[in-house]
Structures are given as structure tokens and as C-alpha cells.
Amino acid sequence: MPLSGDLLRLADAVLFPGFAGHEPPDWLRRRLGEGLAGVALFSRNIAGPAQVARLTAALRAENPSVLVGVDEESGEVTRLEAATGSSRPGAYALGVADDVAMTEALAAELGADLARSGITIDFAPSADVNSNPDNPVIGLRSFGADPALVSRHAGAFVRGLQSAGVAACVKHFPGHGDTAVDSHHGVPEVAADGFKDALLPFADAVREGVKAVMTGHLLVPSYDGELPATLSPKVLTGLLRGELGFQGVIVTDAIEMAAVAGAYGIGGAAARAIAAGADAICVGGEHADESTAAGIRDAIAAAVTQGLLPEERLADAARRVRELAAWTASSGSAATGSQGRAGSGAIAATGARSGARSGDRSGALAGARGDGGAGLVAARRAVRVVRRSTTPELPLAGAPHVVELAPEMNLAIDRHTPWGVGEPLTRLLPGTVVTRLGSGEATGPALERLIGAASGRPLVVVVRDVHRHPWQEEALRHLLSARRDTVVVEMGLPARSDLGAVHIATHGSARVCGQAAAEVLAGSL
């Protein structure tokens, strides 16, 4: 049976496809004119603020009410600053600093930047409680392992973003923190132990008025032993809508991920997600072509004609998406070039207001722009130093040899985003030598050559989640056995602080986190 135009338009009203390039392709312009609800931007679409503003203006010229979304968590997952590294630390660093007013102020600054670029929904923050240090995909994206800490900072992030007129979207419901499987590749399972704690940040975000919640492709046997949360009516309709009382937009994580598409295909997973209670389908991180977007639309429409998806459920989803678009329009963020309600330079004023409301002991970030930027101030406050020896001295006596051990990143993190300590330290201590090694390069002979090359210099070894990568552990052990005066800088999750004569934990790998560590090493902090 041919699919009706009205039904296809209704299916388009719940889709957020991605695309390739810095300008919208013809197929996307056409679909927007036909009523496509949203677009998801990725780093491949972003060259700079002015270009993004032109891009979103072009999208809005085809559909004035289009929702433009982006995964901009700051820190490890950045789309706006993928080419340079983030100027703001990620969630874990903010949790370590544990200044709620600072978190809210940084989120308001981010929201103002997004609003000026014409972006109306940010798929952030992560409200996951990272209770499993071996989690391969959350880690530093979480505010921490304590549910109460995650809850207060996720709430602050929501307030900050939405004060700028940009919708926040907490993720990955009902909590991806206590898992050991990356849902890009498989189906993580959430144990019953600790599930109540994992829900706390989401429940509090709902009370905070968060506009959107992103589902996790997770199996929650205590609610549904067969279907992952994204496809489960028991989790989405029963738990999120019924028990938590959420009335905003339920957004899926990327529907092409193996945890859901592996069993049902991309289109089948999308239709099942809407039937389960989701309102918007994100796609395009890995499949950014016209045929994928058209196939999902057709699969949703076909599910209605086949009786698998009630048309009223699809219409309800489209209504919720329209209401969110109306909120962003009334907030002022939907017009390209808008500064949102937070406005230009809002960080100082927002910080002052937040500090007054929250009893902040730091004065939030007022005046921070004159000291290297608000994000750098926050990154400095997250650095922790553990000394196990009086040698080497800090600051370093001379230009060091920096060895950066670089693991492969998960798919949520742009693999081209720069990170490390070597580059900023080279600026602070001219003559610094930097060597970066991947897993296949950190061989015994290569490490011996490095030890020889570093003779007479301080040695700094930079690692990232060393506890999750045996090759990093082995390389570090090799270097420490030869140079007991080594400074170790951990830019991932610091599961251990007893490595090196001096251990510096940045609690993040954002550009500003590397800068903050370099300042400690050079004595310029």
C-alpha cells in the first residue's frame, strides 16, 4: 500500500537526521520544506561560529520552526570546538570542583554561545552516575560516582543552558554509568543494585524542568528483561512518563547504534522507539545520508499502516516536538544571531546571580574572562596533585621530555580532537620535547629510546584512563622503572594516584585541562 503524504509528513515531524558538510544538502532543504522537525549537527558540520550561524539560518529559511540539536557536553565530547579542544572542562572536572554556581555559570555561557549560533537544543548534560570505573563510554562525561553530586550538577547545567533559551536534554536514561559495554557496539545491562541511585539525577532534572530526556540503549531487567530502554514501553511510558512524571520530549540516542539497530534495523528500531513512548529520533552520527533518513521516515509511516504504531502515538510525539520548538522560539534562541536570554558576556552576571542564590563561596566566575577564560578557571580548580617524592621539584627545573600515551577513543568522542599537555607546556617552557605513542608504538625498544632521549631532562608521562588500557600500564611501568622521578599526568579517570614521583590528575582532557596541568608543571598557575 502506498504511504500517504500526510503520514510521511507526520513521520518527518519526529526525525532529527544528520548530514555531511558545512552547508545543508538539497535533500535536507527539501525535507525541511516538507516539515522535517529537526537536524542534528556533528563536528563534520562545524567550521566556526560564523559558519554555524549561516548554516542554521539556511536551515531555518526552509523551516522556521526547525529544532537544531548538537552533542555539546564540553570537555571530552565537543562538537563546536572539536578542531581545537574544548575551552570548558567536562562534567567530571566540574564534579571534582563541586561548585554548583560555577557549573551553572559555565552552562549559561555555553547556552549563550549555542543560541548565538542558532542551535536550539543541546543533547547534554550526561546525568549518568559513573559508578563503574571501567565504563568504556561514560567516564569523564559524568559528573561523578556520587548520585547526589551528579544530581546537583546536572540540575545546575540544565538551569544554565535553559536560562539562555536553549533546551537541555539529560542523558542516557535510565542511566549508563554502571555498565561495562558501549552501546555503540552491544547491549549494556543495568543491574538492579544501585538502579534507584542511577535514577536520582533524572528525577531531579525532571523536577528542575528539563525540556528533553535522551534514552539510553540499555537493558534494565528490573523493568523489562527483553527490550532495551529506548524500545521499552515499560521504561519510557511506565517509568519516565508515569513514575517520574516527565511531560517533555523523549529523544532517542543515535538509533543506528548496534544496541537497538542490530536486532531490528535502523527503521525498525525507530518505529519501535516511537511506539514505546519516544518522541524524537536521532540518527546520523554514522549514517548521514539521504537514504537513511528517508528509510526511517518510511519505516515509521509503514508501521502505522501495519498496525504496529498507533497513529495517535505518532501524532502525540509530533505535538511534543512542536511544543519544544515553540518554547525555543519564545525563548529567543531560535533566531540566528540571537544571544539567548543569557546574552553576550553573560558569564559574569550569571555567575553573580547563581552565587547569590546558591551561597557560592567562590563568587562563581565573575571576572574570569580577564584570567584566561571561565573554562580555564574551572579547569584549574579541578587539578589535584599528589607528591610521593621531593624529586622532581615543582615547578620543573627545565624544559622536559613529555611522553603522551594515546589510547583509541570511543565513538562518542571525535578522534581528531586534540588533547594533551605537551603543546601548552611547549609554550610555557620553550625547548620542551613531545613524543606521542599509540598502543602499537609503545614497544620496549621505543621506550628505551625515549628513556635515553630524556636523559638530563625532567620526564613527564601523560596517560588517559590508564587503568582501562593494559598497554598504557605496561608502558608506564617500563618508564617508571627507569625514571623514578617521572611526573605522571592522568587526563582520564584517575583510578590510581600512586603512579609517579608526582601524580597530577586533571579530571578531564579538554584543552583547558591540559593548559591547567601545564601551568602546574611550569609554575605559572
Name every feature range the model reports, one short phrase each:
Residues 68-72, 123, 485-493:
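Short beta-strand elements of ligand-binding domains
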